[in-house]
Structures are given as structure tokens and as C-alpha cells.
């Protein structure tokens, strides 16, 4: 019993010692708690890096909902709950900051521009507007999203990346010839439904721009967003801004090199020779029940059995089993290189880029890589100079060269041939004992089979014996812009004028082998072999090696040698487009009220050497108002005219 009393006494002493030890800690914590509970009023002025006060900067105490906004003179006042609090400062277009109070009551803040915040500012209808105050329907992405798709054409890279944008590819898909058609919110007319493309404020094609020269993409979808463009904006507008230098940015050199592989996702899965022959017989008997099962127009069961056991190249004498897609197509190599320099000082900013893109072809058996590839060269130089405190000069220069190389046979023709040729028909005859044209076939490395009127073309012939074409397009684009602040008249007022000139020409070299016609049928211009008329293609079904043993062939298309290539060189009519813009902008904040407006005159004159000049002219206006970024009002109007319409009906008013 005494033992239990001793244990109880020890436990009591232990508890008292623990309590005595804990007390000093609680007492020491009291001053800290008292310090954190004391409030502190902090004030100051917020300016940009040029020393101008910033209006509407948001200041929030980290970890709380307590915040404030800077006034028209950049001043702010905020109460923090304790002296060691942290202030989070943010403003559209500037890098966010976190500032420790450290028991200070006066904190002046300088905001630094940040390109990462540009996504919060959107280019809309010849103007720039905060994303949060836009009433129209828009979508925006940056270059980072586009670089995930290494394609020769920017249009294709937009697929699935912007809501409301439909991307459809209707071209053949050859290197460079794969530009997708863009529609915003579907196709709205049976007529021309192309969207308007605006590059740095100028209506230009963006298809073959390099992703490395692009800053942002914005699409304008509804009437309020597209009204400044008039009736041409009915199908939507895509606005592209290219990269520019930033103020105070140290020179930065970027080099990019990427290599990739391009190939079709999948090919059609067709029947082999055995399956084709089985269903062919079934179809023939269904069409003509009285047909003798032993007819020469049908495949024999022995032939079908041989097809099932055959290797496919007839090296075992059991017949052919061609996969035309596997024979004709292969993966291709993509190469993309770019070098750019970007930087700026307090007075001048610049961005310069050069890039090279090479997309190899997907055709096998082409006689030269030059027959099937696409090349693109891009150059861009954007320079901004602050001539005076109020006058800004911008000079933009863009150049682009594209080179398309493709065989005389079109992609549609080659794919159609792969889709329709029976798998049991050979493409090349490995041996031929007929002296007629023998030397020509030996020189060309194989004997091309020509069957009958149903199968007039040969896959190998289409790939490497139809000649080639080379189309080179050259683009040169330049613009000169002056902008001037009119703050001496009233704060927030500015005026700008811009002139641009674009020129384009095309040079084509065509070395294709012509086709020729007999009656209603068209035949290739290259020489091929054909079974003699007394031994038709139907009879050949069950005698796959007859032509090897007998060697009784005649030329199929009345050509003992390939036709000569028809060499021709053509120069497309050069195009020149000049544009002039003059605009007046106003943006100012009065306390909680934000007011902005824009008035623009636009003139475009397009000249093609052998056509009548075409002119487009218009006025556009925009007015916006918001109260505390909560209550928004926006009015847009376009008054546009086009020479596409008859006199008296050329102009229209388009409000929204």
C-alpha cells in the first residue's frame, strides 16, 4: 500500500514540475501576441517606373480580405492588423509585388512593367482594353500555346485551342499545302465566310508567320466586338500582335532548334488479296446468279488459298498482296530554327527575328527530295523610338519566302489510286523478256504494270515519273507609325497615324509530264506495260506468273518511252496593297469613373497589275464607360464603304 502512495507522490511532483516549466513559455508569448494584435495605418504613393502616379492599383494585406485602391494622384491608405504584415500590390500590365511593412507607416511603391501581365490587356477593334472591362465576346491565347503544335501553318496550330473557333482542313495535306480554313462560331453564309486577320493593326494574312514572332492571338466573336470592321467583320476577326522590345530590357538573344517527325495518324485498313477475292466472287455471283463458278472472271479457290499463304511479293509464286498506302507513304522530318534579339532602353526598343522551317515530304520512291518538300524563311524587325517625351515612332518590317515542291501527280490523285487499286495487282514487274522498251525499263529501275482501262495509272509512276513543280512566293510588308500625346490639350488624349505597304509575287517552275487522252479516257504520260488484249485482266486473276513465263507484252498507253517534261516558267501578277490609318484616342479616369473613346479613319488600296484597283474606306468609333469596373457600357459603330458594290450602295452603318 505504501508502494502505491510513493508512486502517486512522484506523479504529482512530475506534473507540478511540468506546469512550472510551461508557465514561462506562455508568459514569453504574451508580448508577441500583443504586438500582432496592434493595428497600424500605412500610406504612400504608387508610381510607375517613369514617375507617373498610377490610378486603381490594388493593395491587399496578405492572408486577409482587407484591401485598398490607389486614388487619382496615386496615393493610398490602408490599415494593417499588425506591424509585421505583408502587402500584396497588383496592377494590370505590371509585375505584382509583396512588401513587408516592418512597422513602417509610410511606404512609397514603384511598379515595374511585366510582359506576363499583358494577357490581362486585350487588343480589340483597333484599340487596347482591360480584359475585365470588355463587354464583347473574345478569346485570347499566347505563343506558348502555339508552340505545342510544330506545324508549318499557324492556322493548324489553333485547332482546339480557342472556344468558338472552328478549324477545318480541306487541302491535300502536302508539305506546306495544309492551311486550314478558320470559321468563328460556324459558317454563317453560303458565300465567302473567311474571317478577317489583323496583324499589328493591319489587315494581313497570318498563315505562314513563325510562332516565334507572335506575342498573342485574340478572336473577336460577337457584333459589339466586330462592329468597327463593318460588314467584313460579320464572320469574326482574328487579331495578331507580334513581339516587341520592352523598356529597360537588357538585350536578350534567343535561339531555338527543333527536329520532329510528321506522319499520318492512321491509314485505311483494307482487305488483303484473299479477302478481296472472296468478296469479289460473292458480289459477282449476287449480281449474276447464273454465272458459272468456274468462270475465268472469278477467282478460283486455289488462287484464294494461294493468296492466304503468300508472302505478298510473289517471291513464292503464290501471288501479290500490296498495301498501297505502305508502299507510297513514309514519315517525314521537320526542322525548325529561329534566332531573335530583343531589348530596349528608356528611348528605344527593338525585336529582330530570323527563322527557317523545312518540312520533308511523306512520299516514298520520289526521285528527289526536291520534288516533295516545303521551305519557309521568315524575317521580322519591330523598332519603337521615343523621339520626344510625347512623340513615339514605330517602324515594322516583315519578310517571308515560302517554297512549295511537289510531284506532277496531285495528293488527291495518289490517295485515290491507293484507295482503288486491287491488292493483287503488282506495281512493278521484276522480270520482262520482251525486247520492246526493255532498255527504258532497265534504266528506270523497274517495269511498271499497266492493266486495263479501269486501272490506267501506276503508283510508282505517279510518285516519280510525273515530273515536278516548284512554286515560290515572296512577301514584303512594312509599316511606319507616329503617335503623339496631347496631354497639353486634355489629359488622356492622343493622336496616331500609320502608313503601310505590302507587296507579293509568285514564281512557278512547272516540269510536269503531260497526260494524253483517247476517247473519254485519260492516260499517263509515262510508259508502262500491259497484258496483251487476248489475255485480259480478268483471265490474269488465276495466272499470276503468266506474264513472267511468256513475256508477251505490248506498251499500254502507246508510249514506248516517257513523254518529255513540259518545262514552263510563270510569274504571277505582282500585288501591292497600301493602307493609311489616322486615329484619335481618349482614356481618362475621374475618381471611380473610367471613360475611353476612339475615332479612326481607314483607307486601303489594292493594286494587281492586270486588274482594276480595289479600294476600301471606312470610319470606326468606340466609346466605353465603367464605374468601379462593375458597371460597364460600350458603344461601337462602323461606317464602311467598298468598291465591290454598285454606286449608291457602297456605304453602310454598322452600330453595336
Specify the residue positions occupied by each region the protein language model found.
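Short, small/polar-rich motifs associated with maturation and membrane association
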Residues: 1-379, 392-394
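Outer-membrane beta-barrel transmembrane domain signature of Gram-negative proteins
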Residues: 168, 319-342, 429-438, 513, ...
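Residues on the lipid-exposed face of transmembrane beta-strands in outer-membrane beta-barrel proteins
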Residues: 186, 242, 339-345, 381-385, ...
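Transmembrane beta-barrel strands of outer-membrane/channel proteins
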Residues: 253-261, 354-356, 395-401, 497-503, ...
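Flexible loop and strand-edge segments within Gram-negative outer membrane beta-barrel domains
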Residues: 264-266, 315-355, 359-366, 370-456, ...
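A surface-exposed, glycine/aromatic-enriched loop/edge motif typical of exported proteins
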Residues: 265-303, 400-450, 505-550
Amino acid at each position: 500500500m505504501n508502494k502505491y502512495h510513493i508512486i502517486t507522490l512522484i506523479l504529482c511532483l512530475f506534473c507540478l514540475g511540468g506546469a512550472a516549466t510551461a508557465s514561462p513559455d506562455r508568459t514569453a508569448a504574451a508580448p508577441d501576441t500583443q504586438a500582432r494584435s496592434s493595428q497600424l495605418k500605412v500610406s504612400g504613393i504608387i508610381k510607375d517606373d517613369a514617375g507617373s502616379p498610377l490610378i486603381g492599383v490594388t493593395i491587399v494585406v496578405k492572408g486577409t480580405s482587407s484591401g485598398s485602391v490607389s486614388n487619382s494622384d496615386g496615393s493610398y491608405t490602408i490599415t494593417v492588423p499588425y506591424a509585421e504584415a505583408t502587402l500584396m500590390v497588383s496592377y494590370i500590365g505590371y509585375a505584382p509585388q509583396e512588401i513587408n511593412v516592418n512597422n513602417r507607416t509610410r511606404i512609397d511603391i514603384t511598379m515595374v512593367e511585366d510582359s506576363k501581365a499583358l494577357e490581362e490587356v486585350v487588343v480589340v477593334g483597333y484599340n487596347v482594353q482591360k480584359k475585365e472591362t470588355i463587354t464583347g465576346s473574345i478569346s485570347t491565347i499566347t505563343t506558348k500555346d502555339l508552340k505545342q503544335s510544330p506545324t508549318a501553318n499557324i492556322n493548324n496550330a489553333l485547332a482546339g485551342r480557342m472556344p468558338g473557333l472552328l478549324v477545318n482542313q480541306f487541302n491535300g495535306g502536302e508539305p506546306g499545302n495544309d492551311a486550314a480554313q478558320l470559321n468563328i462560331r460556324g459558317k454563317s453564309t453560303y458565300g465567302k465566310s473567311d474571317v478577317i486577320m489583323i496583324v499589328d493593326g493591319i489587315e494581313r494574312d497570318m498563315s505562314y508567320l513563325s510562332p516565334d514572332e507572335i506575342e498573342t492571338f485574340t478572336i473577336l466573336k460577337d457584333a459589339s466586338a466586330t462592329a468597327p470592321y463593318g460588314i467584313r467583320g460579320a464572320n469574326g476577326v482574328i487579331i495578331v500582335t507580334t513581339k516587341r522590345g520592352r523598356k529597360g530590357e537588357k538585350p536578350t538573344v534567343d535561339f531555338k532548334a527543333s527536329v520532329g517527325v510528321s506522319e499520318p495518324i492512321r491509314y485505311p485498313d483494307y482487305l488483303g488479296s484473299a479477302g478481296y477475292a472472296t468478296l469479289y466472287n460473292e458480289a459477282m455471283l449476287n449480281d449474276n446468279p447464273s454465272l458459272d463458278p468456274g468462270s475465268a472472271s472469278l477467282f478460283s479457290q486455289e488462287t484464294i488459298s494461294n493468296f492466304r499463304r503468300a508472302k505478298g511479293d510473289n517471291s513464292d509464286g503464290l501471288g501479290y498482296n500490296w498495301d498501297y498506302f505502305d508502299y507510297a507513304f513514309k514519315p517525314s522530318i521537320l526542322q525548325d530554327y529561329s534566332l531573335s534579339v530583343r531589348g530596349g532602353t528608356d528611348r528605344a526598343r527593338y525585336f529582330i527575328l530570323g527563322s527557317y522551317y523545312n518540312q520533308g515530304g511523306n512520299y516514298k520512291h520520289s526521285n528527289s527530295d526536291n520534288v516533295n518538300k516545303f521551305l519557309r524563311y521568315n524575317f521580322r524587325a519591330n523598332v519603337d523610338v521615343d523621339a520626344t517625351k510625347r512623340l513615339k515612332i514605330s517602324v515594322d518590317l516583315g519578310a517571308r519566302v515560302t517554297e512549295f515542291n511537289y510531284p506532277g501527280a496531285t495528293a488527291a490523285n495518289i490517295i485515290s489510286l491507293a484507295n482503288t487499286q486491287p491488292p493483287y495487282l503488282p506495281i512493278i514487274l521484276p522480270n520482262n523478256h520482251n525486247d520492246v522498251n526493255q532498255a527504258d525499263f532497265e534504266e528506270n529501275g523497274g517495269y511498271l504494270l499497266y492493266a486495263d482501262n479501269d486501272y490506267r495509272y501506276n503508283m510508282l509512276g505517279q510518285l516519280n515519273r510525273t515530273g515536278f513543280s516548284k512554286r515560290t512566293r515572296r512577301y514584303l510588308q512594312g509599316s511606319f507609325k507616329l503617335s503623339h500625346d496631347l496631354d497639353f490639350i486634355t489629359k488622356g488624349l492622343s493622336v496616331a497615324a500609320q502608313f503601310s505597304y505590302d507587296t507579293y509575287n509568285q514564281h512557278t517552275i512547272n516540269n510536269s509530264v503531260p497526260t494524253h487522252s483517247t476517247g473519254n479516257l485519260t492516260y499517263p504520260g509515262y510508259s508502262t506495260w500491259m497484258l496483251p488484249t487476248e489475255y485480259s485482266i480478268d483471265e490474269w486473276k488465276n495466272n499470276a506468273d503468266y506474264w513472267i513465263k511468256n513475256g508477251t507484252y505490248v506498251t499500254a498507253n502507246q508510249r514506248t518511252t516517257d513523254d518529255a517534261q513540259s518545262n514552263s516558267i510563270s510569274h504571277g501578277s505582282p500585288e501591292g496593297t497600301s493602307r493609311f490609318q489616322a486615329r484619335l484616342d481618349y482614356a481618362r479616369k475621374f475618381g471611380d469613373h473610367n471613360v475611353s473613346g476612339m475615332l479612326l479613319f481607314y483607307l486601303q488600296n489594292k493594286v494587281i497589275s492586270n486588274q482594276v484597283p480595289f479600294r476600301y474606306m471606312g470610319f470606326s468609333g468606340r466609346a466605353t464607360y465603367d464605374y468601379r469596373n462593375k458597371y460597364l457600357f460600350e458603344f461601337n459603330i462602323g461606317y464602311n464603304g467598298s468598291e465591290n458594290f454598285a454606286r449608291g450602295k457602297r456605304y453602310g452603318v454598322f452600330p453595336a
